[in-house]
Structures are given as C-alpha cells and as structure tokens.
Amino acid sequence: MKTVRGFASATVGNVACGFDVLGFAITEPGDEVILTLHEERKSECPVSITAISGDGGALPLDPKKNTSSFVVLKFLEYIRTSKGIDFKGHIDLELKKNLPLSSGMGSSAASAAAALAAANELLGQPCSKMELVHFAVEGERVACGSAHADNAAPAILGNFVLIRSYAPLDLITIPSPEHLFCTLVHPHTELKTSFARSVLPRSIPLKTATQQWGNVGALIAGLLKSDYDLIGRALVDVVAEPKRAPLIPGFLDVKHAAIDCGALGCSIAGSGPSVFAFSSSKETAERVGQAMREAFLLPETNLKSDMWVSPICKEGAKVL
C-alpha cells in the first residue's frame, strides 16, 4: 500500500482583460488530495472516494461526478491507451477542501490539479505536466459544464498561462515579475459560475473588442517587461466586469478602496464573487487587502470576507 499527497493552490481566471484566455496561480490557499494505492481492485470502478472534508457535504461521492476523482479516471484511461500502462489496482481518494466553492478562486481546478499531481507520482510519473492539463480541463466540464482552461492550466503549471487556442489546446506560460503580489479577497457570499456566465453578451461591438485586445496585449507585455505601471494600466475589463459587477455586493467600493490604497489594479477573480488586486510589494498588498475587507463591511453591503496575500505561484500542482 502506497500513499501520495497532492496539493494545488487557488487560481484567478480572466485576470481582468483576459476573459477565458488568461489565468495565474497563487501560493495559498489550496486543496489537498490524498491517494492510496491498493494492489487489488475493490470494485468495477478503479477509484473510490473515501472522504471529503471542508465542503459542508456539497460535493458528490460518486467518482464519476466528482472533479478530483473524474480526472484520475481520465488519467488512468489515457495511460492505458497511450502509454501501455494497464492499471489493475485500486485507488482510494481523500479530498481536503480548503477553497470555498463557487468563489472565483478556481476551487474545482485546484482539486483536479492536486489529484492529478498525486496520481502521476503514484504511478511513476508517466505524464508531463502539459499532458495533465488536458485532464484538468475535462474536470472543469464536470464541475461547471464548460471545459475552460484559465484556472485548470495555471493550477497545474503555475505562473501566468495564456491560452492561445482551445482546439488544439495551445498554452503559453508567462513568468511573473519578481515583486508582483496578489491580494485575493473572498466575501462571504456565493455566485454560481453558470449564472455569472449567463449575464454576459453573446456578441460585443468591434470597438469594445479592440479595447479588450489592446489591454490583454499590454498586460502580457507588462508582465514580460516587469513594467508595473503598464500592468496597472492594462488591468481593465470592458467585456465581463461591467456585466458582473452588479452581481457582487459592494464591488465598486472595494475596487475604489484597492486603487486608493496603492494597488496597481483590481478586478473580479474569475466569475466572482472574489476580488483580486495586484501590487508591487507585499506591504502594499497587505494594506490593499485590509482596505478591501473594510469596503465589504460598509453598511450598505456589510459582508465579512477572507483575505490572502501571495506572490505568484511558480511551480503549480505538486506532491507534498
């Protein structure tokens, strides 16, 4: 019997102007998955979920419906058909959720990435990290009905990841400037990803599209040049944020508080309700976080929140 513990951290998808094509990982918080290998098959399905903690009973125990176990099943199928590894044993899976559900923090992607890191290690690392991304993306389809990669890819690979194409999946990792820090604030409210996507327009004017393209190009350039001023100027979302901002109580107050306190920029994390900000020092990022939390507590909103300050995670999913 062999046991492996996998860990993957929170991620932020979209990054303001990079709707569905850009995301990054932070160092904490994150989900942990513990896999135990048994020599003999216990059931027809080679993976069983033995325990889930931290989800309040919300996540399914059916291995074909839970993101963390589903991606392990896809991984086992792939190594059988593509690597010639016919797994005859059984895997028990324990999931420790440290990320809130429906938070905009890449909760499902973290579970999938942690499970894949552990499974790959458990079976002798037959797959590269880039191969693992494909399974994590399929896990997103189970979680929310859409196989998007802006959380799944950085959860596996770390750093910033640009999705150039989905068919075929073409990913570009982008290093983070040394002193770039993320403040992530999660208000104690829930916003379903499916609903947040439903408010978005099916088409946008060409003028709006060119604004968004200019901003995402500038953001990539700012990251590569370590140009913090350019990063701040580029963190403008003219597509999703205007539609989603009304869904997050107090968002505009929180954003203004972050900017007034010295943040380079501030926007919605993924589909929300979490909000992120970038700063060029840890000290500024911590001050920004306190200001954002205080803004959520204003009388018209009065929402408690959790806060994390982190550099960009450079290694992605890992084995503990």
Curated annotation (Swiss-Prot):
Function: Catalyzes the ATP-dependent phosphorylation of L-homoserine to L-homoserine phosphate.
Keyword ATP-binding belongs to the record: yes
Coiled coil: none
Localization (cell): Cytoplasm
Binding site for ATP: 100-110
Protein name: Homoserine kinase
A GO molecular function held by the record: homoserine kinase activity
